[in-house]
């Protein structure tokens, strides 16, 4: 299930090293290894850089003492870690050295083919942060950062779901903000798909370039794909894997928005009873 010999970034290193590695490889996070001997030192994600945008040294940005798993661990063990800790990268370590990595998508591929009676409403467990379609991005983006979410359902004046805003949607004209891109040290500005993976960093570093006339409705995905509270988790997993979604809005029996379901929520179906 794991990806062997994953892409890494090394320490000593800089913020720009991590950002450019994410952009080139269309990733949102990376294991960090020591350049001298390849020992795992931590992990770094776009959110880590997002929270420490003024820091340049990778050793001060990355998460140290990260949770790891052994090569012979079971899928159930991995599922328990993902759902319990709500993390999105699980380094596989042997003798202190990185030998692979597991992500929620790897586990979701197993869930989509399983038979289960569990549904979306059985695993929704987090507070749902929403945005109003008419509010400026200068308000929404800091709110997303404080709430530590990468996607928000968007509502109209009547409380109806009209869209979803993710960090990948917050880009309109990369050349317009070329100076801000330089501030982040991004080299491969032509790699749009990879660039979108670090958009939270872009908007954090470039708040001084933002104006109040950029509204949520101009950047959101309209009429997003949703699931219902009674949707089977295998079907939710299939939708996520097939569409490269990390989260989806959930509707109730009266078609009202009741929350968001995340990949790490769906994985709970494989976690079993912690006492087993």
Predicted regions and their residues:
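Tandem CBS (Cystathionine beta-synthase) repeat/Bateman regulatory domains
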Residues: 1-276
């Amino acid at each position: 299930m794991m990806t062997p010999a994953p892409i890494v970034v090394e320490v000593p290193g800089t913020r720009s090293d991590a950002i450019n590695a994410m952009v080139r490889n269309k990733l949102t996070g990376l294991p960090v290894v020591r350049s001298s001997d390849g020992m795992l030192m931590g992990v770094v994600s776009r959110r880590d850089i997002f929270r420490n945008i003024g820091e340049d040294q990778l050793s001060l940005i990355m998460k140290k003492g990260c949770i790891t798993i052994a090569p012979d661990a079971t899928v159930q063990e991995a599922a328990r870690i993902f759902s319990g800790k709500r993390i999105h990268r699980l380094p596989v370590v042997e003798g202190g050295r990185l030998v692979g990595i597991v992500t929620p998508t790897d586990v979701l591929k197993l869930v989509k083919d399983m038979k289960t009676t569990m549904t979306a409403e059985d695993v929704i467990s987090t507070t749902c942060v929403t945005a109003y379609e008419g509010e400026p991005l200068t308000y929404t983006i800091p709110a997303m950062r404080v709430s530590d979410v990468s996607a928000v359902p968007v509502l109209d004046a009547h409380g109806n779901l009209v869209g979803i805003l993710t960090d990948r949607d917050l880009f309109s004209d990369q050349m317009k903000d070329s100076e801000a891109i330089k501030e982040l040290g991004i080299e491969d500005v032509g790699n749009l798909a990879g660039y979108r993976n670090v958009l939270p960093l872009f908007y954090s570093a470039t708040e001084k370039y933002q104006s109040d006339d950029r509204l949520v409705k101009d950047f959101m995905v309209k009429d997003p794909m949703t699931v219902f509270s009674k949707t089977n988790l295998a079907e939710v997993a299939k939708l996520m894997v097939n569409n490269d979604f990390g989260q989806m809005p959930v509707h109730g029996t009266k078609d009202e928005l009741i929350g968001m379901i995340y990949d790490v929520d769906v994985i709970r179906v494989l976690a079993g009873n912690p006492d087993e």
